[in-house]
Amino acid sequence: MTIAIGKSSEEPKGLFDSMDDWLRRDRFVFVGWSGLLLFPCAYFALGGWFTGTTFVTSWYTHGLASSYLEGCNFLTAAVSTPANSLAHSLLLLWGPEAQGDFTRWCQLGGLWTFVALHGAFGLIGFMLRQFELARSVQLRPYNAIAFSGPIAVFVSVFLIYPLGQSGWFFAPSFGVAAIFRFILFFQGFHNWTLNPFHMMGVAGVLGAALLCAIHGATVENTLFEDGDGANTFRAFNPTQSEETYSMVTANRFWSQIFGVAFSNKRWLHFFMLFVPVTGLWMSAIGVVGLALNLRAYDFVSQEIRAAEDPEFETFYTKNILLNEGIRAWMAAQDQPHENLVFPEEVLPRGNAL
């Protein structure tokens, strides 16, 4: 037996190397350097949302009840945006508005900026987590690239849009019914459904759902029968080394259905990645345009003709009138601080009123 005497040739690890070893260690839930951003931000964003929807009123910012404590349910509770008078203030707890008073900070809408900013950085941390893990196991980074779509939509809707308007007040509040109100607002004040970027977004998301359904059904239909099990998967073995389904059979089937079909898996799966991510990015670009109050597809000639000819009406002119109704009814309720009062004769009336 040989005994080595003397100092180890290994250099002592520095702080960075020690942290790197601990953060990137193989464990049940990977932490990583991205976790230093993801986990605290996700914790604070979710904690702020649960706190706000449970306890905090929107009486001082919107004149509304918005918490479980006030009688709201899961669909009507929300963390509401700050008052319009606070413009684009970050509403820091220690800032000049709240001056360290937590109750006052909640009343002013401080939880909304808290949730929005921590939520944005939490999403970015999640994307970085996918980059980091992909690099660790030597994968391509397409998962992270795909997740840039939801991040772009979140940042454009919750941060860039209100930055282009007069304040955070015009961003969506964090709640189900609150988001519905925001959608109605977008339609009435921006004619959003006729915006080509919205159209591309809808085509991307619904097209992706269609592709996902077709792809899943096709794979199920062409699974190799490799056992005597009774269910769809037969005796499918999760560790089998051979191919699970027949691409050749799938190609023949869709060639007969449509006349064209994907001939290789790489192009097929890239297309399934490209369609929804591009749709989400187009929507985000469109919302940035709305932040600047850009308009799209105003068919003025139809509006003029409809105004001159009582018998001429299109679905477009009908929608324009509906948008005017949304604005007239919504503005006074939605922006109580403006003290808007519309004469009775200008408010649109349905047949039942």
Curated annotation (Swiss-Prot):
Please name the GO terms that the record assigns under molecular function: chlorophyll binding; electron transporter, transferring electrons within the cyclic electron transport pathway of photosynthesis activity; iron ion binding; oxygen evolving activity
User: Quick one: which residues bind pheophytin a?
Assistant: 130, 143
Which residues bind chlorophyll a ChlzD2 per the record? 118
Query: Which Pfam families does the UniProt record give?
Result: Photo_RC
**Chain positions with N-acetylthreonine modification:** 2
Cofactor binding note: The D1/D2 heterodimer binds P680, chlorophylls that are the primary electron donor of PSII, and subsequent electron acceptors. It shares a non-heme iron and each subunit binds pheophytin, quinone, additional chlorophylls, carotenoids and lipids. There is also a Cl(-1) ion associated with D1 and D2, which is required for oxygen evolution. The PSII complex binds additional chlorophylls, carotenoids and specific lipids.
**UniProt-annotated binding residues for chlorophyll a PD2:** 198
Q: Which reaction does it catalyse?
A: 2 a plastoquinone + 4 hnu + 2 H2O = 2 a plastoquinol + O2
Please provide one cellular component term from the Gene Ontology annotations of this protein: photosystem II
Residues that bind a plastoquinone:
215, 262
- Other known facts: 2 of the reaction center chlorophylls (ChlD1 and ChlD2) are entirely coordinated by water.
Physiological role: Photosystem II (PSII) is a light-driven water:plastoquinone oxidoreductase that uses light energy to abstract electrons from H(2)O, generating O(2) and a proton gradient subsequently used for ATP formation. It consists of a core antenna complex that captures photons, and an electron transfer chain that converts photonic excitation into a charge separation. The D1/D2 (PsbA/PsbD) reaction center heterodimer binds P680, the primary electron donor of PSII as well as several subsequent electron acceptors. D2 is needed for assembly of a stable PSII complex.
Subunit note? PSII is composed of 1 copy each of membrane proteins PsbA, PsbB, PsbC, PsbD, PsbE, PsbF, PsbH, PsbI, PsbJ, PsbK, PsbL, PsbM, PsbT, PsbX, PsbY, PsbZ, Psb30/Ycf12, at least 3 peripheral proteins of the oxygen-evolving complex and a large number of cofactors. It forms dimeric complexes.
Q: Which protein, by its recorded name, is this?
A: Photosystem II D2 protein
Q: Which organism is it from?
A: Anthoceros angustus
